């Protein structure tokens, strides 16, 4: 995966024996479907042809489903989008999702990569969704983060 401004270059790696799950919301379908496509492509490039994919309605549902997926997967990728509106709802949802995913990852000792976009506008989300006109592919980046972290944890545990 090639990096852009501040984005690290991630060399090719083999994660074919990593059990990967992806949980993606369905709000803002075009954006979430693009994030999921980027995640699937990175998984395939890493040797994973059939990751478990679960779709949920909104971002707030992602942490509890991610928690369940950590029970029998080595890595989980969380994908979705929350776009700022006119009420504090945005702040509450973003905080709950971020804290929830972090807690799930730490409690389960399983990497849970946060690919939930939290943007001020739909345009910002589209620019990060991995579409042909996007500058970034956060679905791909989150998947690379989850898989490389799973491989790192495997190495550390083998040394213990």
Curated annotation (Swiss-Prot):
Domain of life of the source: Bacteria
GO process terms (BP): riboflavin biosynthetic process
Pfam family, one: DMRL_synthase
Keywords attached to this entry: Riboflavin biosynthesis, Transferase
Known pathway: Cofactor biosynthesis; riboflavin biosynthesis; riboflavin from 2-hydroxy-3-oxobutyl phosphate and 5-amino-6-(D-ribitylamino)uracil: step 1/2
Enzyme class, UniProt record, top EC level: transferase
Coiled coil: none
Residues binding 5-amino-6-(D-ribitylamino)uracil, per UniProt: 27, 59-61, 81-83, 114
EC number: 2.5.1.78
GO molecular function term, any single one: 6,7-dimethyl-8-ribityllumazine synthase activity
Catalytic residues in the record: 89
The UniProt record lists the keyword Transferase: yes
Sequence positions that bind (2S)-2-hydroxy-3-oxobutyl phosphate: 86-87, 128
Listed GO CC annotations: cytosol; riboflavin synthase complex
Catalytic activity as recorded in UniProt: (2S)-2-hydroxy-3-oxobutyl phosphate + 5-amino-6-(D-ribitylamino)uracil = 6,7-dimethyl-8-(1-D-ribityl)lumazine + phosphate + 2 H2O + H(+)
Gene3D superfamilies, per the entry: Lumazine/riboflavin synthase
Family: Belongs to the DMRL synthase family.
Task performed by this protein: Catalyzes the formation of 6,7-dimethyl-8-ribityllumazine by condensation of 5-amino-6-(D-ribitylamino)uracil with 3,4-dihydroxy-2-butanone 4-phosphate. This is the penultimate step in the biosynthesis of riboflavin.
HAMAP family xref list: Lumazine_synth (MF_00178)
Assembly behavior: Homopentamer.
Protein name listed in UniProt: 6,7-dimethyl-8-ribityllumazine synthase
Gene: ribH
């Amino acid at each position: 995966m090639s990096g852009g401004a501040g984005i690290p270059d991630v060399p090719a790696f083999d994660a074919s024996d990593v059990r990967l799950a992806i949980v993606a919301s369905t709000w803002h379908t075009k954006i979430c479907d693009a994030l999921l496509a980027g995640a699937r492509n990175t998984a395939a490039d890493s040797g994973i042809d059939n990751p478990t994919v679960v779709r949920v309605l909104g971002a707030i549902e992602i942490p509890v489903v991610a928690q369940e997926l950590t029970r029998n997967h080595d890595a989980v990728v969380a994908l979705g989008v929350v776009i700022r509106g006119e009420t504090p709802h945005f702040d509450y949802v973003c905080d709950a999702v971020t804290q929830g995913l972090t807690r799930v990852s730490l409690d389960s000792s399983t990497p849970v990569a946060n690919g939930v976009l939290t943007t001020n506008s739909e345009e910002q989300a589209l620019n990060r969704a991995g579409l042909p006109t996007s500058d970034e592919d956060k679905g791909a980046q989150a998947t690379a983060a989850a898989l490389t972290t799973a491989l790192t944890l495997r190495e550390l545990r083998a040394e213990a």
